Amino acid sequence: MGVFFVGTSLTLRQCPLSLFVCHVFPYGSFHMGKRILSNFRGTKCPPEPPPQTLPDLLTFADQRLAIVYPVIQTFKKTITSDPLGVTKTWVGSDICNYKGFFCDSPPDNRTATAVASIDFNGFGLTAPTLDGFLDQLLDIAVFHANSNNFTGTVSPKISQLRYLYELDFSNNNFSGKFPTAVVNMVGLSFLDIRFNSFTGSIPAQVFTQTLDLLFVNNNNFMEKLPDNLGNTSVRYLTLANNKFMGPIPKSIGKAANTLVEVLFLNNQLSGCLPYEIGLLVEATVFDASLNQLTGPLPCSLGCLEKIEQLNFAGNQLYGAVPEVVCALGNLENLSLSDNYFTHVGPICRNLIKRRVLDVRKNCIQDLSSQRSVAECALFFAHPRICLNLLSYSIIPCKSSHWPFPFPWKFPPRSSSAQSKQPKAPSPSYSALIKHRL
C-alpha cells in the first residue's frame, strides 16, 4: 500500500498583544501588568483558537495511482465547464471509481493497478488544453474524449505513452497541424480526430503505421494525399469533408487485402480514377462523391465482389456506365448522379428499376431527370482526357459473372442481398456524425 499526503504545512499563529497580557498577567497583580492592562481597558481575551489538524492522509491501492492523483487534480482545476458534474466524483484516493476513469493491470506488472483507460465521451468538459494531463498518464491504453470542448494543439509528449492503442479526440476544438506525435506510437491501432480544426497535410508516415482505423474527416486538411496511401494497413479510412486536392493515389491498390471502407467524399480531388481501385477485393464501401474527378469509370470496378456501397455522385465522370459494374451481386447502392454519363446498358437499367442505381442529372437522353442537351454539349466541348485509356477496359480478376452470354441476364443476387437481414451500421459513414462511435 502506498501513501500520499495532501494538505498544507503547519504555520505558527500570531497572537495579539491583548491575549499575551491576559495570559502573562492574568490577575493584574504587577504594576507593569496594571499599566499594560490600562492600555487595553475593555478588551476581552479572544477565544482559544481551534487546535491545528494534521493534513488528510490518502491511501492508494498502488503507487501508480498515487503518482497520477496530483496530475488529475491539477487538470480538474483547469476545467471551466462541467455540465454533467462528473468532476465532483474526482475526490479522494479511489481513482478507479472516478467517473470516466478505469483501472487495470499494466502490461509490465500484472500485480499492479493503474489508470488504464479514460472515457470522457459526451461529458461536454471545457478546458484550454490536455497538455500536462494525458501525456502524464504513462500507463494509459485507451483515451476517448468525443464531444467535449478541449482546445489548443496536441502535445508531442503523447508519443511517450507506450501502451496507448486507442486515441479519440473527435468533436473538440483542437487546431494546428496533424498531431505528428502519433507517428511514433508503434502500438496505436485506432486514431479518431474527426470534427476538429486541424490544418495542413497528412504525413506520409501515417500510412506506414499498423492502424486498423483512421478517421480524419471534417477538419481543414488540404494538399495532396500522400503517394504511399496504399501502404496502409487501415481497414476503415475516412478522409471526407476536408480540402484534399489532386488525384486518388494509384498505390491504393496495395491495400487490396486490408481496406474494407474508404470515404473520399466532399474534398477537392481531381484527375481520373485509377484502375487500381478495382483491386480492393475486400472493400464493401467506396465513396468518392462530391469531388472534381473526371474520365470514365474503370471496368476494374467489376472486381469489387464484396462492394455494397459505391458512390461517385457529384463529379465530372463521363462515358458509358460499365455493365460489369452493374452486375456486381452485393450492390445495395450505386450512386452516379450529377455526372456526365451518356449510356447505360440492360443490366444497369435493371438496377435503375430496382432503385439500386441512381443516374439522375447525367447526359443519358432517353432517361428522365437528365441534364439539358445544351449543358451536356458545353461539357463535351472541352473534354477531359485521361492518360492510358486502355487501362479503363482492364478487368484484373477472374469473375464468375462476366462476361454474360447474349441476351443479357441479370445475375442472381447474393444470399446476403436476398435475405435483407439488418446489418450493423457502416463505421465509416457513422463517423460523419459527431457522436461517439
Regions found by a protein language model. Give the residues of each.
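A generic tandem-repeat structural signature
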Residues: 132-230
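LRR flanking "cap" motifs
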Residues: 79-132, 369-372, 387, 414, ...
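Leucine-rich repeat domain C-terminal region
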Residues: 304, 308-318, 322-393
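The feature encodes a structural signal of leucine-rich repeats
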Residues: 129-135, 154-156, 175-180, 199-204, ...
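Eukaryotic tandem repeat interaction scaffolds
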Residues: 222-321
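Consensus "Asn ladder" position of solenoid repeat domains
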Residues: 123, 148, 169-172, 193-196, ...
